[in-house]
């Protein structure tokens, strides 16, 4: 029994082992293999892949499964994957003729295509322009996206007359259907031309299409013409005045500038004819500014008799209608009224023709309205002669001072410029000694130079209280007769020598006191023994102030033997120095007054400046 039991135990163990092995084999046959698209085998295990739109951050292990994360913006994954990062979307560049057909997302990629008229070329992987079909060819429809155009010839009854990559062939126009006849048959490149059976006629309103434009054009031209005419008239009336005012302002500004520079400059210097014999040289006080005036009807004027006639003395009838050129004082108002006149140049004075010397110089009475022959002062250099200030002056060598061969009161008179009157009066010796007297004795004024000395002379016109003024205006602000006589008597030499002294002696005596009753002349004093200028402001550019010029009869222009050389004009630095004041020297005897004239100095001894038109 025992051996039989031992034999049964190994058999049981063998059967148990076979059962275990069978179970293990069944288990191995039931487990699926890792061949699916959603799984992958790792470390003897079959693990899951990541779904579309996610990427695998870490793979599976023996104890854990795979780890998946979503894609970022502009990234995608379109399938189950075991990728460690997502893919980027394509960029559809419009500069390369690309457009996005499908925008795409995290699970779908973006799709780009060429724009219309372009197609994708595999040669360059870029978009190219579609082929354009020539006339007679048409594009085959339907057009395919990203495909080049396919051109085909137009069939009969169809035409294509332009280059196009999209247009297909068009049919000809059916003229019969339109009720017209065919004028030209169509071709593959041109359409058929139809014509109406009725003759064509122009619309009746066609000319009216251009009529409004023509009317507008004519209206515009008329308005422009009228505006041009109005502008021309206004410019002629106002533009010239504005231009004249502008030029006047410029000239006035330049005159002031030049006047400031020349205020202390030289003055006009003039030499005149030397006189011979016992007759002394006549000297007078003359005004530089000249004006024209007409004699009043009751004025005494010269006759050919050479002396004052009865009509002059008695106040009888005078000649009517006779005009004369006058010399008068110029007030500030009169100068300003004439400020718009053209300023004469130096050449205009130099080129004037000379005038005859048989005419006299006259003065208007104060306050009379006058018109000056020139509105601006004359400028003369320091080395120039005063003769250019008065046109037509010549040296009269043979003439005598105060030679009364020409009449003093009435003469056959021819008008001439005032400056010529001034110079001719000086050159011919007609220098009335009552010219500067404030209250002259008219009994001595019209003294005929041909009468013997000592004889009584009838006045030219009468006293200033009862008649018009004589040739020289009274009230010029000059010293009285008695004061001038006393001053002249003190200045003459004690030895009773000839009254004619050299210029140096007269200049030395000129430093004495001013005449009694008159204040010394204010302003700049310039010149030498031959000429003296006095002004209270600008010398050559003045307004309202009177310039008195003292002219000596000693001339360097003639061939006189006794003439002294002309000195150079000197500008005095201060008002205290007046050594060159020529009017302060001893006076020459009056040749027209006889022996008494040799002893008595002349009345017009010193020039005095007037302070304006009011004192005249």
Curated annotation (Swiss-Prot):
Q: Which cysteines are joined by disulfide bonds?
A: 34-46, 47-60, 50-68, 71-86, 92-112, 114-127, 124-126, 133-151, 154-169, 175-194
The UniProt record lists the keyword DNA damage: no
Known outcome of mutating residue 53 to R: In OPTB7; two patients with osteoclast-poor osteopetrosis
Q: In which tissues is it expressed?
A: Ubiquitous expression with high levels in skeletal muscle, thymus, liver, colon, small intestine and adrenal gland.
Q: Where are the transmembrane segments?
A: 213-233
Query: What's the protein here called?
Result: Tumor necrosis factor receptor superfamily member 11A
TNFR-Cys repeats mapped onto the chain: 34-68, 71-112, 114-151, 154-194
Role this protein plays: Receptor for TNFSF11/RANKL/TRANCE/OPGL; essential for RANKL-mediated osteoclastogenesis. Its interaction with EEIG1 promotes osteoclastogenesis via facilitating the transcription of NFATC1 and activation of PLCG2. Involved in the regulation of interactions between T-cells and dendritic cells.
An example Gene Ontology biological process: response to tumor necrosis factor
Query: Polar residues bias located where?
Result: 524-536
PROSITE patterns found in the cross-reference section: TNFR_NGFR_1, TNFR_NGFR_2
Q: Which GO terms describe its molecular function?
A: cytokine binding; metal ion binding; signaling receptor activity; transmembrane signaling receptor activity; tumor necrosis factor receptor activity
The upper taxonomy is: Eukaryota, Metazoa, Chordata, Craniata, Vertebrata
Q: Where is the composition biased (Basic and acidic residues)?
A: 483-493, 570-580
Q: Does the keyword Signal apply?
A: yes
Stretches the record annotates as Disordered: 468-536, 556-616
Topological domains annotated Extracellular: 30-212
UniProt-listed InterPro entries: RANK_CRD_2 (IPR041648), TNFR/NGFR_Cys_rich_reg (IPR001368), TNFR_11 (IPR022323), TNFR_11A (IPR022361), TNFRSF11A (IPR053075), TNFRSF11A_N (IPR034040)
């Amino acid at each position: 029994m025992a051996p039989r039991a031992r034999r049964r135990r190994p058999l049981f163990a063998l059967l148990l082992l076979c059962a275990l092995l069978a179970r293990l084999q069944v288990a191995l046959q039931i487990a699926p293999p890792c061949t699916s698209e959603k799984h992958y085998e790792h470390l003897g295990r079959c693990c899951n892949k990541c779904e579309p739109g996610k990427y695998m951050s870490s793979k599976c292990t023996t104890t854990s499964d795979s780890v998946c994360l979503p894609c970022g913006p502009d990234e995608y994954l379109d399938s189950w994957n075991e990728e460690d990062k997502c893919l980027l979307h394509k960029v559809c560049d419009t500069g390369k003729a690309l457009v996005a057909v499908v925008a795409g997302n995290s699970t779908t990629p973006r799709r780009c295509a060429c724009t219309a008229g372009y197609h994708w070329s595999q040669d360059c992987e870029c978009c190219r322009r579609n082929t354009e079909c020539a006339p007679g060819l048409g594009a085959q429809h339907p057009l395919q996206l990203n495909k080049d155009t396919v051109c085909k010839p137009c069939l009969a009854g169809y035409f294509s007359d332009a280059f196009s990559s999209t247009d297909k062939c068009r049919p000809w126009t059916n003229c019969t259907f339109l009720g017209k006849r065919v004028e030209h048959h169509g071709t593959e490149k041109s359409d058929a031309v139809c014509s109406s059976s009725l003759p064509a006629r122009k619309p009746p309103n066609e000319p009216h299409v251009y009529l409004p434009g023509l009317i507008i054009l004519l209206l515009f031209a008329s308005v422009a013409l009228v505006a041009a005419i109005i502008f021309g008239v206004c410019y002629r009336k106002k533009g010239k005045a504005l231009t004249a005012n502008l030029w006047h302002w410029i000239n006035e500004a330049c005159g002031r500038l030049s006047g400031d520079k020349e205020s202390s400059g030289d003055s006009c210097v003039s030499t005149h004819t030397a006189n011979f014999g016992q007759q002394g040289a006549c000297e007078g006080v003359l005004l530089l500014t000249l004006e024209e005036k007409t004699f009043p009807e009751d004025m005494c004027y010269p006759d050919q008799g050479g002396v004052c006639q009865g009509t002059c003395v008695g106040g009888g009838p005078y000649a009517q209608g006779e005009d004369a050129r006058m010399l008068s004082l110029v007030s500030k108002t009169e100068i300003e009224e004439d400020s718009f006149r053209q300023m004469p140049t130096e050449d205009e004075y130099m080129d004037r023709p000379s005038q005859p010397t048989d005419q006299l110089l006259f003065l208007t009475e104060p306050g009379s309205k006058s018109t000056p022959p020139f509105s601006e002062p004359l400028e003369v250099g320091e080395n120039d002669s005063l003769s250019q200030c008065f046109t037509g002056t010549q040296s009269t060598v043979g003439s005598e001072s105060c030679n009364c061969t020409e009449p003093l009161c009435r003469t056959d008179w021819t008008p001439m410029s005032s400056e010529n009157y001034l110079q001719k009066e000086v050159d011919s010796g007609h220098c009335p000694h009552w010219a500067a007297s404030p209250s002259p004795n008219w009994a001595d004024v019209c003294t005929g130079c041909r009468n013997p000395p000592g004889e009584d002379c009838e006045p030219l016109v009468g006293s200033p209280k009862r008649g018009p003024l004589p040739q020289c205006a009274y009230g010029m602000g000059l010293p009285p007769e008695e004061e001038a006589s006393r001053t002249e008597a003190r200045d003459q030499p004690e030895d009773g020598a000839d009254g004619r002294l050299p210029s140096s002696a007269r200049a030395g005596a000129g430093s004495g006191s001013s005449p009694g009753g008159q204040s010394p002349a204010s302003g700049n004093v310039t010149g030498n023994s031959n000429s003296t200028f006095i002004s209270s402001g600008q010398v050559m550019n003045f307004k309202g102030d009177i310039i008195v010029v003292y002219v000596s009869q000693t001339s360097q222009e003639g061939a006189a033997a006794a003439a002294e050389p002309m000195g150079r004009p000197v500008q005095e630095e201060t008002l205290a120095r007046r050594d060159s004041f020529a009017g302060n020297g001893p006076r020459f005897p009056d040749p027209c007054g006889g022996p008494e004239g040799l002893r008595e100095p002349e009345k017009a001894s010193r020039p005095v400046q007037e302070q304006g038109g009011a004192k005249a």
